[in-house]
Every structure is written in structure tokens, then in C-alpha cells.
Amino acid sequence: AGSYSYDCYTTLYYGNASKGCLWAVEKNKKDAQAALKTYLYENDNLVEEAGWSTSNSYIHLLDTKKHTISGDIRVEGDYRFYHDNGDYTSGSAPVVRYSTSRSAAERMAVTSYPTNAKGETYGSYLDRNTVGQAPDLIAAMGENGVEGYIRLNDIAPELFTLEEIRQYQAQVDANPVIPLYDLNGKVIGSFVRGTTQDLAAPDPVIAQKLDQMTGGKSANFLPSAQPIPVKHDYPTTANGESY
């Protein structure tokens, strides 16, 4: 990534409630700008996503909220590593998997998506790299365990600059709930996107690992839980107040 070199990996913390974490560590301990997003799946359904988190350090991490799940559990994430000239290197971290079933079959590679009556593609967000793009409708488990689909533009719109990422996340922080649909576009529930506020209480296990990596300085590297203010195109007074 430009003049930087990263180790990027995911970890799954499995228990009565499970969570995932995406890590990116600059090998030479050089501080740099990065943006991360982490996903937790149950049986191909997206159940938790940690909203975009940006930071400027040599250790970047982002964990999802805990979720009680079973079956085939997977964690993965997306990253943006920014170069000094403003360009960036993007990609997806390797998937970590755990199955609660001893007889679980290996997941087959998907190379194309089916379409609904409206011509919209649908499937798991896990398959976006093998297919070459994400589906229009992403398989997800919403509130109260309702299974359905969320729209790609609601969960992963095209973003390029750090400012675009920050402003998208600011909108999510202000209004995290999005509709959950059936295949025909009927609203059947809701899905809660990850917010910056979710990071207010650091996970003790992750903080302990970070302390081991940094000699007890985990507080310097934990992601910020301070919500990003939404920018408005309102004029302002001399005191900076919008009107």
C-alpha cells in the first residue's frame, strides 16, 4: 500500500455470543491512514457489520457487536489503506470460519447470482469477490431473527475518499436502521447497521490482546467511539452556528 506494508487478518471470538474483529498492522510500525469494516455471518446471512472506522496509527482494528449465532459462522472485512499521495489500496481480509456442526459441508464457490422477478441479483455478500461484484440484495438476518435481504446501497455504497467514508458513517450513526426485504421488495423487518457509538465499551479480550501487542498502550489504538457529525450545507453565523 504505497510505502506501507500491512499484515491484515480476521479473528472470530466464539462463545454464547460471538463476534468478529478485523486487524491491520503496519509491519514497520509506521502510522498511516486506514479505514476498516467488519462483517459477521451465520449460514451466509449477514448478522452484524461494524460500520466504517478510520484511524491514523500503525495498528488498526474494528470489531463487530456480539451476536448469539450457531451453524456455519464466518468473519471477514474490507479495508482501505491510504497512500501519502491520497491514493489507496483496497481489498478484503481472509475469511475465518467456525462451524457448530461436525458434519458441516465445505462451502462451494459461487461465480454468479440468481435474479428475482425484477431482474435484481441476490445472494450472500461473502461471494462478492468470487463473482466480481456484490449482489443488489444481500442475504441478512434482521432484528428478531427475521431472514431476508438488505439493499447493497444501504449497506455498502461506492465510497472513495476518507471524507466520503466519514460522511457516510456519520449518516449511519444518525440513522442506523434500514429496511429488511423479501425477494419481491416487500418490507418484512429491519436491520441495524453498525455505528461508531457501538465502540464505546471496548471488548476486554481484544483490549488485552492489544495491550500485549503495544506494551500496555491499548488505549492509544482502540477505535474512536465519538460519532462523526453530519455535514450540512447550511450557512453559519460568526459563532459557527448554522441557520
Predicted features and spans:
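Glycine-rich loop/turn
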Residues: 117-148
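Acidic, glycine-rich low-complexity segments with interspersed aromatic residues
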Residues: 158-160
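Low-complexity, intrinsically disordered tandem-repeat tracts enriched in small residues
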Residues: 114-117, 225, 236-238
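Mature secreted bioactive peptide module from preproproteins
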Residues: 1-112, 136-141, 150-156, 169, ...
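N-terminal post-signal-peptidase region of extra-cytosolic proteins
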Residues: 162-166
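N-terminal prepro-regions of secreted/extracellular proteins
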Residues: 1-14, 212-227
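C-terminal partner/receptor-binding element of secreted or periplasmic proteins
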Residues: 93, 101-108, 172-224
